[in-house]
Structures are given as C-alpha cells and as structure tokens.
Design a protein with these regions (language model features):
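Core transmembrane helices of Major Facilitator Superfamily
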Residues: 1, 194-206
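Helix-to-loop junctions at the C-terminal end of transmembrane segments
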Residues: 149-160, 245
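Juxtamembrane intracellular "pre-TM" segments in multi-pass secondary transporters
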Residues: 69-102
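Pair of pore-lining "gating" transmembrane helices in MFS-fold secondary transporters
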Residues: 95-112, 193
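Structural signature of the two symmetry-related core transmembrane helices
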Residues: 52, 163-178
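C-terminal membrane-cytosol helix-exit motif in multi-pass small-molecule transporters
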Residues: 53-74, 267-272
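Cytoplasmic helix-loop-helix junction between adjacent transmembrane helices
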Residues: 1-24, 208-209
Length: 277
C-alpha cells in the first residue's frame, strides 16, 4: 500500500505518505475504542463482524479506484520464479545505501517508541501518576503525531527530506532523554507531545526519501525493507530498555536509547553527505 501511494504521488510524496500513515494511525487509535465499546454493548460477535464490514468496505473503495497496474515482471508459472525475483529485489535494495541509512533512522526512532510503550507506564506509576494520567500521555503523543504527519509531509516536499529527518531525530532524542528526569504530569504531557511531533517529522520524511531513493521497479521492495527495519527497531526497544533499566536506571536507559537516535542522525548526515559528492 505504501508503494502504491508513493507511485501515485511522485511530486507530492511527503504529503501523500504523511496522510497515509496518519490514516493508518487513526485506525489503530479508533479500533480499540470502537471494538471495546461494541464488545461491551453488543458482544464480541458484533465487534468482529463490524471489523470485517469495515475491511470489505475498504476493499470495495480500493477496487473503485481503477488503478493502472504495471505488467507482471514474472511471467513464468510456479513458486521458483517468484522467489528468484524476490531475491533480486532484496539484493538490489540491500545495496542501496540511501534506503538502508534512511530506514535505520526510522529504526532508531522506533526503538525509543517501543521503549516508551513498555516502560513509560511503569515510570509514570512510580512517580505518582494514576492509570488515567498515564493513558493520557500516550493519547497526547498519538494525537500530536496523527495531526503532524500530513503537515510535515507537505513541509518535506518543499524544504527537503534530509533536514527534517535530522531535526525529527534530535527532537525525539531530546524529549526522550528528558522524560525520566521529570515527575510532573504537565511536563510529561509536553514531552510526550514533543516526542509525537518528532516521530511524525521522521516518519513522513523518511518514507518519502526511501521512495525517492528506490528504483521504480524496486519501489515495493524499498518500502518493504523500510517497514522490516522499523519493525526490528520497534521490537528491540522494550528488550533493550528492560535490560538497561535492570542494570542501571531509567535515566541511564533512556540516555543510551536517546544516544542511539543521535548516532543514527550523525550516521545519516555523514552517509548522505558522502553519497551526494
């Protein structure tokens, strides 16, 4: 789906991909609320049937777009030709340094995101926040990210992807490292909102840059590689944070993970500067 959006909007990829990721995020925000309400008021069957109906509606809308499909690149029948083409696509993307370094910035951001999801609730409770306040921290982060992605995508179309990726990583690092030094609910709200904004800046710009840096015939492979690297980062965040918190402290753990984001920003800047020569 990301590759389709990137292919349709070549001139306004930042805005288009920012809007796309915001829409997917709105689904993840609305799903638990709507599903929980339906399960409570009408039962699990109604909740799951409703989810299925929404999925069918999405399929119908997609097919009504009547998109022009490129001819298949693999004409031979069987699994072997398909696997061979997949291997070629993976190798081509793996050699693309722009795609790899850009994906690594998303991974660094997602390490912090995963760590926040796992341990911000525990930290919040340890400084005296209640469960409702902890939930509001995540809501503010998600809403800020949701509202910022389309806007920052448009900005990246005008000013370029690279400066925004660097700025977003630094914002994420600064807000992330500050959280375990704060016990005030109001300040934690500000920091959570700031992290959500930085996350939106990185996500909208990095997706567009990966699309810009991928060959047309490898666009899907490039976007897939970015998604895989992001998922690895997101899954690694709780594990890394847990090990660090167990051996040092919240402050030390958050400092190390913030340092990873700064290192990713430096590596991204240095690599892109080298490749542009």
């Amino acid at each position: 789906a990301l590759a389709t959006v990137a292919d349709l909007y070549k001139e306004r990829r930042g805005a288009a991909l920012g809007t796309y990721t915001a829409c997917t995020q709105s689904g993840s925000l609305l799903g638990p609320f709507l599903g929980g309400w339906l399960a409570y008021t009408a039962g699990f069957s109604t909740a799951f049937v409703t989810a299925g109906v929404f999925g069918c509606i999405a399929i119908l809308i997609f097919f009504r777009l009547h998109l022009d499909e490129p001819p298949p690149r693999v004409r031979e029948r069987g699994l072997a030709p398909v696997m061979a083409e997949m291997g070629k696509g993976f190798l081509a993307v793996a050699r693309n340094r722009k795609v790899l370094i850009t994906s690594s910035t998303d991974a660094a951001k997602m390490v912090a995101n995963g760590a926040l999801m796992a341990f911000l609730p525990l930290y919040g409770l340890s400084v005296g926040l209640n469960a409702g306040q902890v939930g509001l921290l995540f809501s503010v982060q998600a809403v800020t990210s949701f509202l910022s992605k389309p806007v920052m995508g448009r900005v990246s179309d005008r000013v370029g992807r690279q400066p925004l990726i660097l700025a977003g990583l630094l914002i994420c690092a600064a807000t992330f490292i500050s959280m375990p030094h704060v016990g005030s609910f109001a300040l934690l709200l500000v920091l959570s909102s700031g992290f959500g904004f930085g996350e939106a800046v990185v996500s909208s710009s990095s997706a567009a840059l990966v699309a810009d840096s991928s060959e047309f015939k490898r666009l899907g492979a490039g976007m897939g590689m970015q998604g895989t690297v992001m998922d690895i980062g997101h899954a690694s965040g709780p594990l890394l944070a847990g090990l660090l918190i167990a051996h040092v402290s919240y402050q030390g753990a958050f400092a190390v993970i913030a340092g990873l984001q700064i290192l990713a920003a430096i590596a991204f800047w240095a690599t892109m500067r080298t490749l542009s020569r």
